A protein has these predicted regions:
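Short amphipathic helix-loop junctions that connect adjacent transmembrane helices
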Residues: 24-35, 215-231
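Central cavity-lining transmembrane alpha-helices of secondary-active solute carriers
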Residues: 42-55, 237-249
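Conserved MFS/SLC helix-loop-helix module at the cytosolic interface between two early adjacent transmembrane helices
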Residues: 50-86
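Helix-to-loop junctions at the C-terminal end of transmembrane segments
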Residues: 52-63, 246-259, 346
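Cytoplasmic membrane-interface "Motif A"-like loop-to-helix N-cap segments
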Residues: 61-71, 256-268
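Cytoplasmic helix-loop-helix junction between adjacent transmembrane helices
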Residues: 95-131
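Juxtamembrane intracellular "pre-TM" segments in multi-pass secondary transporters
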Residues: 175-202
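C-terminal transmembrane helical hairpin of 12-TM major facilitator-type secondary transporters
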Residues: 261-308
């Protein structure tokens, strides 16, 4: 079981690394107007809105492994397209949309939940959260460095390489056994469930703030304050230290100590504070304001992210793929809206 879980954690890690590694630099390196760059960031999310829940449903029907393989292949195709045409904003948008069509995040989470016993799930969900946290930290530090030396296309080639590695690992994993559950809940009833809606709406706003932040920070620091693009990694590295620590706290207290609700409320409050500080930073043209806002943002995101997936996976067994698909679809809906909002709000400061 452990080999299965760690293989899946790597696949999830690679998926999130591929997502995070693009965010810090796309707004600084992509050529185009602010709204086009926002759309390039958000196209991935728009596609996920459409395909996340159907992929989750598909995995409930044909099995997690087959659904994962299909999603990895689609994501790899989109990555190659982005790598080849990274200088064309419209083809970049198309490639990002194809990347998002390989919506396997929920499938991988459901796969892990299927093979881990109920009494051990909190421990492995904490490890999954730690894997996401490590992807987040590594992406924030490495992305600006790689882009400054090799260009934006190199990051997409890296995403394609991670797809190949993930596919090889997937070949060695066994399909989880199907268990007959006594649940009679329909998909429609599941979506109407109060807890499902609360978690999904929370994920929408969390990812909206995430993408708005990453579109904004590139436009503000580079476009307005004259910060060197090659030095962006320094900002992200410092922020990631705080975020990584917060992710560990969330993984331990959220599942192991049953403090998920308290941690999530704390993340919401810190989110609001970080946005307030960051939104006023262009008016003061003070990089310290932007940095403090970024640190608070990383802490808030890292506290909230591990909790959402873990809590949703506990709500249902028979339709776990659908539930996590709905959660991810709402999250990527927020990502798409946040990308456009961030570009729209900060565009006047970089014109």
């Amino acid at each position: 079981m452990k080999r299965q879980v760690f293989g899946l954690i790597f696949i999830v890690w690679a998926r999130f690394f591929g997502l995070f590694v693009i965010l810090p630099v796309l707004s600084a390196y992509a050529s185009g107007e602010a709204w086009q760059i926002g759309l390039a960031v958000g196209a991935y999310a728009l596609s996920q809105i459409i395909f996340a829940a159907p992929f989750g449903h598909l995995s409930d029907k044909i099995g997690r492994k087959k659904a994962l393989a299909l999603g990895i292949a689609i994501y790899g195709l989109g990555s190659v397209l982005c790598a080849i045409f990274s200088d064309s904003i419209y083809l970049l948008i198309l490639g990002r949309f194809i990347q998002g069509a390989g919506a396997v995040g929920a499938v991988a989470s459901a796969f892990i939940a299927d093979i881990v016993p109920e009494n051990s799930r909190s421990k492995y969900m904490a490890l999954l959260g730690l894997g996401v946290g490590m992807a987040f930290v590594l992406a924030m530090i490495s992305s600006p460095i790689i882009a400054s030396y090799l260009g934006l296309s190199a990051l997409f080639w890296l995403c394609a390489l991670l797809c190949v590695i993930s596919a090889v690992i997937l070949l060695g994993l066994a399909e989880p056994e199907k268990h007959e559950h006594n649940e009679t809940t329909t998909t429609y009833e599941l979506i109407k469930n109060k807890n499902v809606r609360i978690l999904s709406l929370s994920n929408f706003f969390q990812k909206m703030f995430l993408n708005a932040f990453f579109v904004s920070i590139g436009l503000v620091l580079v476009g307005q304050m004259g910060f060197e693009r090659a030095s962006l990694w320094q900002i992200y590295a410092l922020c990631a230290v705080f975020g990584f620590f917060s992710m560990g706290v969330a993984g331990f207290l959220g599942d192991a100590k049953g403090k998920a609700k308290e941690l999530f409320f704390a993340s919401v409050i810190i989110f609001a504070l970080s946005l307030l500080v960051f939104l006023i930073s262009p008016s003061f043209e003070n990089i310290l304001f932007a940095f403090v806002g970024a640190v608070l943002f990383f802490i808030a995101f890292s506290l909230g992210e591990p909790i959402l997936q873990s809590q949703m996976s506990k709500l249902t067994k028979a339709k776990r793929g659908v539930a996590l698909g709905v959660l991810n679809a709402c999250g990527y809906g927020g990502s798409f809206v946040g990308s456009l909002l961030g570009a729209s709000y900060f565009a006047p400061y970089v014109m």
